[in-house]
Swiss-Prot record:
It comes from Brucella canis (strain ATCC 23365 / NCTC 10854 / RM-666). GO terms for molecular function: DNA binding. Gene3D superfamilies: 2.40.50.580, 3.40.1350.60. NCBIfam families: sfsA. Pfam families: SfsA, SfsA_N. Belongs to the SfsA family. This is Sugar fermentation stimulation protein homolog.
């Protein structure tokens, strides 16, 4: 996935009100950018961090700049949670996930469950219809181990329960974690940060929901899904 226009670099001053960030650009300008991420962005908001932003002069936009990448631990990390669905689609179409090969139809944002929309729906294939829920991952606290979630996510647990219902109805329920950073070799559920989500994940896997984690390579030009990484046992829930 390529960024449509070259990104602009700068230094993060602060992130605040969840959706805003103050940035000093490399040319000296001080700007306020939109932050397309509703999560905590744990470990990614240190003042002084190198950041990269996209720019749009569309007249309807309140903020012309959008935060796309943060440098953390000498690694570029994608923070735009609007991109993982597109990255996941590209990963599936190029055969990066063999168990999702062979489907002739891929649809986006289809209604299902309890007033929800599934991110990707795969149909007309050699196996039952596959409902794919995509989650963005960018949290690391142990070298090499990417984790989800980085904060409590009741909505994420709800999606897991709906995938269980999908499996019970005879379809495939898929949880696909898109890791927007390259400095990891494995993935795990952070049960100590959200025990409720961890238990929901455990129930889902026991009920037949499938889970995959894909690592990405991030550059100033774009984000590319590169390979599957193994999913480890969850952190122990006290």
């Amino acid at each position: 996935m390529l960024f449509p226009t070259p990104l602009i670099s700068g230094r993060l001053e602060r992130r605040y009100k969840r959706f805003l960030a103050d940035v000093t650009l490399d040319d000296g300008r001080f700007i306020t950018a939109s932050v397309p991420n509703t999560g905590s962005m744990l470990g990614l908001t240190a003042p002084g961090s190198r950041v990269w932003l996209s720019f749009s002069d569309a007249p309807h936009r309140k903020y012309a700049h959008t935060l796309q990448i943060v440098e953390a631990d000498n690694t570029l990390v994608g923070v735009n949670t609007g991109l993982p669905n597109r990255i996941a689609e590209e990963a599936i179409l190029k055969g990066l996930i063999p168990d999702l090969d062979g489907y002739a139809t891929l649809k986006r944002e289809q209604k299902y469950g309890r007033n929800s929309r599934i991110d990707l729906l795969l149909d007309d294939g050699p196996r039952p219809r596959a409902y794919v829920e995509v989650k963005n991952v960018h949290f690391i606290r142990t070298p090499g181990l990417a984790e989800f979630p980085d904060t409590v996510t009741a909505r994420g647990a709800k999606h897991l329960d709906e995938l269980v219902d999908v499996v019970a109805a005879g379809h495939r329920g898929i949880m696909l974690f898109i890791i927007q950073r390259a400095d990891c070799s494995r993935f795990g559920i952070s049960g100590d940060l959200d025990p409720f989500y961890a238990r929901a994940f455990e129930r889902a896997i026991a009920s037949g929901v499938e889970a995959w984690a894909v690592r990405c390579h991030i550059t100033e030009n774009g984000i590319d899904a590169t390979e599957l990484v193994p999913i480890e046992d969850m952190r122990r829930i006290e």
